[in-house]
Amino acid sequence: MSQITIALTKGRIEKDTVKLLTQAGFDMSFMADKGRSLIFESPDSRFRFLLVKGPDVTTYVRHGVADLGIVGKDILFEHPTGYLELLDLNFGLCKFSLASVPSYDPHDHKRKRIATKYPTVATDYFNQKGEDVEIISIQGSVEISPVLGLADAIVDIVETGHTLSANGLLVFEDICRVSARLIANQASLKNNPDIMPFVAKIESLVGRREVAFK
């Protein structure tokens, strides 16, 4: 049996993945007391898990260090190449939205400044609308950009909307749905015969979960 290395996004996606794999019948108890460790191997050596930041999941998969990766679709929009996207896992649900202060007019034809941590998503969104905008890349708290006058509006991930409302912002348009995805290294799919049966088992479970959610 060949070991499968899976790169996981630390945090909520990591926790939801552990729940999913437990429901699929895998013993994930070895992940319970992580401490500061970032690499974990299952007792039967079938799996090795790497806990990394979201953008790094695609890097580890692209270079073949990880066979599979579980990461938010928001990351895949910004890093679209070097892997195969296999499954929508139907957790980590949120959305991309256009938000700003209440006085913002989305129909104003002046050239707007848009602050975002996701320049590819923002650029594609405004290109589809036929609007020429200036994209300002922000790595930190993008919500304060319209309040301070740095930008006219923001494009950002929205889960509950609490952070937006706490900073006096409103959602003007929802752009697209975001969820966790299973990605794979193409060479690993070809060379490791244990990957596709594992993927099929997860796909079966995700399909049942999706039906249950409807």
From Swiss-Prot:
<comment type="similarity">
    <text>Belongs to the ATP phosphoribosyltransferase family. Short subfamily.</text>
</comment>
<keyword id="KW-0368">Histidine biosynthesis</keyword>
<keyword id="KW-0328">Glycosyltransferase</keyword>
<dbReference type="InterPro" id="IPR018198">
    <property type="entry name" value="ATP_PRibTrfase_CS"/>
</dbReference>
<dbReference type="InterPro" id="IPR024893">
    <property type="entry name" value="ATP_PRibTrfase_HisG_short"/>
</dbReference>
<comment type="pathway">
    <text>Amino-acid biosynthesis; L-histidine biosynthesis; L-histidine from 5-phospho-alpha-D-ribose 1-diphosphate: step 1/9.</text>
</comment>
<comment type="subunit">
    <text>Heteromultimer composed of HisG and HisZ subunits.</text>
</comment>
<dbReference type="InterPro" id="IPR013820">
    <property type="entry name" value="ATP_PRibTrfase_cat"/>
</dbReference>
<keyword id="KW-0028">Amino-acid biosynthesis</keyword>
<dbReference type="GO" id="GO:0005524">
    <property type="term" value="F:ATP binding"/>
</dbReference>
<dbReference type="GO" id="GO:0005737">
    <property type="term" value="C:cytoplasm"/>
</dbReference>
<keyword id="KW-0808">Transferase</keyword>
<dbReference type="GO" id="GO:0000105">
    <property type="term" value="P:L-histidine biosynthetic process"/>
</dbReference>
<dbReference type="InterPro" id="IPR001348">
    <property type="entry name" value="ATP_PRibTrfase_HisG"/>
</dbReference>
<comment type="function">
    <text>Catalyzes the condensation of ATP and 5-phosphoribose 1-diphosphate to form N'-(5'-phosphoribosyl)-ATP (PR-ATP). Has a crucial role in the pathway because the rate of histidine biosynthesis seems to be controlled primarily by regulation of HisG enzymatic activity.</text>
</comment>
<keyword id="KW-0067">ATP-binding</keyword>
<keyword id="KW-0547">Nucleotide-binding</keyword>
<dbReference type="GO" id="GO:0003879">
    <property type="term" value="F:ATP phosphoribosyltransferase activity"/>
</dbReference>
<protein>
    <recommendedName>
        <fullName>ATP phosphoribosyltransferase</fullName>
        <ecNumber>2.4.2.17</ecNumber>
    </recommendedName>
</protein>
<dbReference type="Pfam" id="PF01634">
    <property type="entry name" value="HisG"/>
</dbReference>
<keyword id="KW-0963">Cytoplasm</keyword>
